[in-house]
């Protein structure tokens, strides 16, 4: 399941593009998530009222949350699989407070892959997509293990 050094490099190369515009990428990813899986919107009291893509694009709260999500994910990706310290508080909040099912993390992973490919087709070809998929799968597997430790089977 681990990634090679080359695969991590592909992940981090495209992540540099994400970090250059966290707000834009985060907004696009969350909009893609909410449009593709409207049930995920119900987990966000702040966003439940956002019914259209125009509403979502106009929401400063959604933009801020996108920055929060991608900042946390970036910190995890930069650890190249050695992310236990970063994962623990994230798993704690997502399992006990927000009760976010692992399935929803799969949905946002799909949204991330889609948005990165649409925004950076040259830098996010098949090899980079494969590497990012592996990195996100590793993240989900490890957070699922933390969920289990916390007694959450979402």
From Swiss-Prot:
Gene3D superfamilies linked to this entry: 6.10.140.2100, 6.10.140.2110
Residues holding heme b: 94
Any one GO MF annotation of this record: metal ion binding
Keyword Iron attributed: yes
GO cellular component, one term: sarcoplasm
The entry's keywords: Cytoplasm, Heme, Iron, Metal-binding, Muscle protein, Oxidoreductase, Oxygen transport, Phosphoprotein, Transport
Compartments it resides in: Cytoplasm, Sarcoplasm
Biological processes, Gene Ontology terms: removal of superoxide radicals
EC assignment: 1.7.-.-, 1.11.1.-
Modified residues (Phosphoserine): 4
Similarity-based family: Belongs to the globin family.
Subunit structure comment from the entry: Monomeric.
Protein's name in the database: Myoglobin
């Amino acid at each position: 399941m681990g990634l090679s050094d080359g695969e991590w490099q592909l992940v981090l190369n495209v992540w540099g593009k994400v970090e250059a515009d966290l707000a834009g990428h985060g907004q696009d990813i969350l909009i893609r998530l909410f449009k593709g899986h409207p049930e995920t919107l119900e987990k966000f009291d702040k966003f439940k009222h956002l019914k259209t893509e125009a509403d979502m694009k106009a929401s400063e709260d959604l933009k801020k949350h996108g920055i929060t999500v991608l900042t946390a994910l970036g910190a995890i990706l930069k650890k190249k699989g050695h992310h236990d310290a970063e994962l623990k508080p994230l798993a704690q909040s997502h399992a006990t407070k927000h009760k976010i099912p692992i399935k929803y993390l799969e949905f946002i992973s799909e949204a991330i892959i889609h948005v990165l490919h649409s925004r950076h087709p040259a830098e996010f070809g098949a090899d980079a997509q494969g590497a990012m998929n592996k990195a996100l799968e590793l993240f989900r597997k490890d957070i699922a293990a933390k969920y289990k430790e916390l007694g959450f089977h979402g």
